[in-house]
Design a protein with these regions (language model features):
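Helix-to-loop junctions at the C-terminal end of transmembrane segments
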Residues: 55-68, 154, 260-272, 355-356
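Symmetry-related core transmembrane helices of the 12-TM Major Facilitator Superfamily/SLC fold
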Residues: 161-180, 362-380
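Juxtamembrane intracellular "pre-TM" segments in multi-pass secondary transporters
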Residues: 1-3, 185-213
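Intracellular juxtamembrane helix-capping segments at the cytosolic ends
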Residues: 110-125, 312-326
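C-terminal transmembrane helical hairpin of 12-TM major facilitator-type secondary transporters
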Residues: 271-318
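C-terminal ends and interior cores of transmembrane alpha-helices
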Residues: 77-92, 283-295
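Extracytoplasmic gate region of multi-pass secondary transporters
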Residues: 23-24, 206-251, 255-259
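Hydrophobic core of transmembrane alpha-helices in multi-pass small-molecule transporters
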Residues: 14, 95-112, 299-312
């Protein structure tokens, strides 16, 4: 039972990655279809950001009342509906319809993120093995598959409409099939068993280590989200490459993300979280700095990979650190997750408004500043001395 459950969640993580990178790979063409400038695209992306935050909040309601399985089914329908609306809106060159589609897709994606991570923690508890890093790597692999499909579809001249509709159908059917292997009421049962002595939301927010972890997650999730949203357009506008080439370069960022998540497990066990996080931050900062300098396209491509490699560990490491003490893990992980997702979703649209004034490459200096801020708090990911014996 656990093996089928595990495989089903891997597929759901992968499909989530495919869906989001499909949208990112077609953003330059959607922008052209809408005849929108960078500032307008930033506002359009707010639809995705707001929808995702709404989905994150609503997921708690659905999971507590109906369980993770029902939440995943609802999220799959919302993502299908959102992608369909997005495809139609792009074809009609309607900014309003595209924004509405992104809102629906974002709501489904946010809800799915919470539910599938919950299922992952339940599988870990059931089989007594750590599998969440593999699940997150599956998401990254999905983003690479989606980007690769985007390159192929653009090369073949397949329209945005057909591409998005095909992915919408594949996403909905695959997740629907996978839910057959997910137990009923996972999150519902877990919520009902939570002790009354868990840390309150107010107390959790006052914990210095939790605040530091939230700051790291906020900064580095913003770094990752900015790359996802703006690398294709930055390559087209800043380096004057074709739409298909911009997607190839974006795929290099995804390769960096995947590599970081696949190889980090053993390195973290050997050298510790703090050292690995500092190395990751240096990698992201160096990569982004070289991209901004605009030395050459070859240097840019190598730097994009370094950016992805460095950005891969921020979110997973802070969530892992927030869960060190099982007595307070629920609230602390929730705070770190919410901080990260909020920055990842709301930061890039704001960056777009700034880029409309100074250009995307210059706007990336703000992202570089966020990386530096994260570096200040790296000690927070170390396991507390009181727990190191356990």
């Amino acid at each position: 039972m656990e093996l089928k459950w595990y495989k089903a969640i891997i597929v759901i993580f992968t499909m989530s990655g495919i869906s989001i990178s499909t949208w990112f790979s077609r953003t330059p063409e959607v922008r052209d279809l809408l005849q929108a400038n960078t500032g307008t695209m930033g506002l359009i992306l707010l639809g995705l950001s707001v929808g995702s935050i709404v989905g994150l909040v609503l997921s708690n309601v659905f999971v507590r009342k109906k369980g993770g399985r029902v939440a995943i089914v609802i999220s799959a329908f919302l993502m299908f509906l959102g992608f369909t609306t997005l495809a139609i809106g792009s074809t009609l060159s309607s900014i309003f319809v595209v924004t509405a589609g992104l809102f629906l897709f974002g709501a489904g994606s946010g809800m799915c993120n919470v539910a599938m991570n919950l299922e992952g923690t339940e599988i870990e508890y059931s089989i007594k093995k750590t599998i969440l890093p593999i699940l997150h790597a599956s998401f990254s692999i999905g983003t690479l598959i989606g980007a690769g499909a985007g390159i192929l579809f653009i090369h073949l001249g397949i329209s945005v409409l057909i591409h998005l509709l095909a992915i919408a159908l594949l996403l909905f059917l695959s997740i629907l099939i996978c839910t057959r292997f997910i137990p009923h009421g996972t999150g519902k049962d877990q919520h009902e068993k939570l002790p009354d002595t868990v840390e309150s939301s107010q107390t959790a927010w006052l914990n210095k280590r939790t605040i530091s972890l939230a700051m790291i997650a906020l900064c580095l999730a913003f770094v990752e989200g900015s790359a996802n949203d703006w690398i294709p357009l930055a390559m087209v506008d800043g380096y004057q490459v074709s739409h298909s080439m911009s997607t190839v370069i974006y795929a290099l960022f995804l390769c960096g993300m995947i590599s970081g998540r696949l190889i980090s497990g053993r390195l973290i066990d050997r050298f510790g979280r703090v050292l690995l996080l500092r190395v990751a931050i240096l990698s992201a900062a160096a990569g982004l700095f070289l991209v901004i300098l605009k030395i050459s396209l070859v240097v840019c491509m190598i730097s994009i990979f370094l950016w992805g490699l460095g950005a891969s560990l921020g979110f997973p490491l802070t969530i892992s650190a927030a869960g060190d003490d099982s007595r307070y893990a629920v609230k602390r992980v929730s705070i770190v997750t919410l901080s990260g997702y909020t920055a990842s979703l709301s930061g890039p649209p704001i960056l777009g408004l700034l880029a409309n004034q100074v250009g995307l490459l210059h706007a990336f200096i703000f992202v570089l500043f966020a990386i530096c801020i994260a570096g200040i708090f790296t000690k927070a990911v170390a396991k507390p001395h009181s727990l190191q014996a356990h």
